[in-house]
């Protein structure tokens, strides 16, 4: 007969097919249902519209949404690098232009799009009563070198995992809090270091997942997290 694992797999497969093929699964992706003024508030570019889509997915009951930080061009707008290269601000020797300018790899291009889209998401979630039960995490996998690696027309910075920042909002996080501190050039952590597992534990805490939850079988059982949640961030 069928095992429990096989039955679970069939059930999940059926639910996934229903989600992908049914009208309830398609509707969140129909962004033209939104007022144009709201779409423009997010920004008529890939990042803005993807964050609007994320809100619609959350509103429809999706429990976990990941949005790539691609700051590509709006329709009819020139510029914008490929999706794999947003925020890849190495500078001239990588053929990516000035990391501090307004070109498609520059902070003058990327940051305004992020500011516009992320702030619109926060306001929109809050207005719909969704922010308190939705944790928003904005983070990359590393920072950038504190010292500029190239001079001249196209300066930039290399990868720097030793010190960087993340933004958390909603999900019980109290607004306006700052946790930790770097030195004055952002080279190293000066106060309250946070490890990746601590960030993970903080996310689990926000979602109500017990940190002593055991996962894995057949000799590989382990706690779901080895980190410590940053409890002072919660109001």
Question: Over which residues does each language-model region extend?
Answer:
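Ligand-binding pockets and gating/stacking loops
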Residues: 1-235
């Amino acid at each position: 007969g069928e095992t429990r694992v096989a039955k679970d797999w069939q059930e999940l497969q059926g639910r996934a097919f229903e989600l992908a093929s049914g009208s309830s699964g398609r509707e969140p992706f129909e962004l033209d249902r939104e007022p144009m003024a709201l779409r423009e508030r997010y920004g008529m570019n890939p990042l803005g519209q993807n964050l609007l889509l994320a809100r619609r997915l959350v509103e429809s009951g999706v429990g976990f949404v990941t949005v790539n930080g691609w700051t590509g061009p709006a329709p009819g707008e020139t510029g914008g690098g490929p999706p794999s290269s947003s925020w890849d601000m190495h500078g001239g020797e990588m053929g990516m232009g000035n990391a501090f300018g307004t070109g498609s790899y520059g902070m003058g291009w990327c940051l305004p799009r992020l500011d516009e889209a992320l702030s619109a998401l926060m306001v929109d979630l809050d207005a719909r009563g969704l922010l308190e039960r939705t944790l928003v995490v904005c983070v990359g996998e590393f920072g950038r070198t504190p010292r500029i690696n190239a001079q001249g027309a196209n300066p930039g910075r290399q990868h720097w995992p030793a010190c960087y920042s993340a933004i958390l909002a909603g999900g019980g996080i109290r607004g306006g809090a700052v946790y930790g501190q770097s030195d004055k050039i952002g080279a190293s952590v000066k106060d309250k270091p946070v490890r990746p597992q601590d960030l993970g534990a903080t996310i689990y805490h926000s979602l109500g997942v017990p940190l002593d939850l055991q996962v894995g079988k057949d000799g590989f059982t382990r706690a779901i997290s080895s980190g410590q949640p940053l409890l002072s961030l919660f109001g």
